[in-house]
C-alpha cells in the first residue's frame, strides 16, 4: 500500500509540473504606438457619454511630422487601426447629420487646413482600404500652430458653444473639430 501511495504522489507531482509549463503565457511588449481613448464628458464619473474615440498614439521620435503625415493623402489619424469614433446621440459635422453609432475617423491633411472624414467603414487597418463612397460626413477645418510641441499624437474632447470639440494635436500642429447637436 505504501508503494502505490508513493507512485500516486510522484504521478500527481509530475502532472502538476507539466501543467505549469502548459499554462505559461508569453505576453507581447507594450506597443510602440499605444492605444488610447478620449470621451465627452471626460469626467470618468459621468456615465452618460455623448461621444468616445479610440485611437493609437504614434510618437515623433526625432522624425519630422511631414514624413509621418504627408499632405494630400488620406491619413489613418494615428497609428495602426484607424480611430473608431462612437456617437451616443445624433450629431452634426458641419451641415451633415451623423446618426448615433460607430464610425471610422480619417483625415486629409493639407498645408493650412485638414479635412475631417467620418466613414461608415469599421475595423480598418490604416487608410489603405479607404473608400470615399463610404463617407458619412466631411468638414475642412483650419490648422493652427502652438508654441509647445507634443511628442505623442493626442486627442481630447472639450465643450463647444453648440456641442463638442474634438481637439487633435501633434508636434506644434493643432486642429479643433466642432461636432454640434
Residue spans of the language-model regions?
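Alpha-helix boundary/interfacial micro-motifs
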Residues: 12-21, 106, 111-113, 118-119, ...
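Mid-length scaffold segments of soluble, non-membrane domains
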Residues: 75-124
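Bacterial Sec-dependent N-terminal signal peptides
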Residues: 1-27
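Primarily secretory-pathway and cell-envelope proteins
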Residues: 23-76, 124-181
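Weak global preference for isoleucine
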Residues: 6-12, 50-53, 85, 98, ...
Amino acid at each position: 500500500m505504501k508503494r502505490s501511495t508513493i507512485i500516486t504522489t510522484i504521478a500527481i507531482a509530475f502532472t502538476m509540473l507539466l501543467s505549469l509549463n502548459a499554462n505559461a503565457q508569453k505576453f507581447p511588449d507594450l506597443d510602440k504606438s499605444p492605444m488610447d481613448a478620449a470621451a465627452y464628458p471626460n469626467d470618468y464619473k459621468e456615465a452618460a457619454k455623448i461621444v468616445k474615440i479610440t485611437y493609437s498614439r504614434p510618437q515623433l521620435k526625432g522624425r519630422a511630422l511631414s514624413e509621418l503625415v504627408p499632405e494630400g493623402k488620406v491619413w489613418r489619424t494615428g497609428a495602426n487601426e484607424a480611430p473608431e469614433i462612437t456617437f451616443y446621440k445624433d450629431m452634426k459635422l458641419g451641415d451633415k447629420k451623423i446618426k448615433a453609432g460607430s464610425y471610422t475617423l480619417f483625415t486629409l491633411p493639407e498645408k493650412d487646413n485638414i479635412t475631417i472624414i467620418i466613414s461608415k467603414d469599421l475595423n480598418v487597418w490604416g487608410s489603405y482600404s479607404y473608400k470615399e463612397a463610404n463617407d458619412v460626413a466631411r468638414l475642412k477645418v483650419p490648422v493652427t500652430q502652438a508654441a509647445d510641441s507634443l511628442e505623442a499624437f493626442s486627442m481630447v474632447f472639450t465643450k463647444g458653444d453648440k456641442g463638442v470639440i474634438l481637439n487633435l494635436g501633434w508636434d506644434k500642429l493643432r486642429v479643433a473639430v466642432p461636432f454640434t447637436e
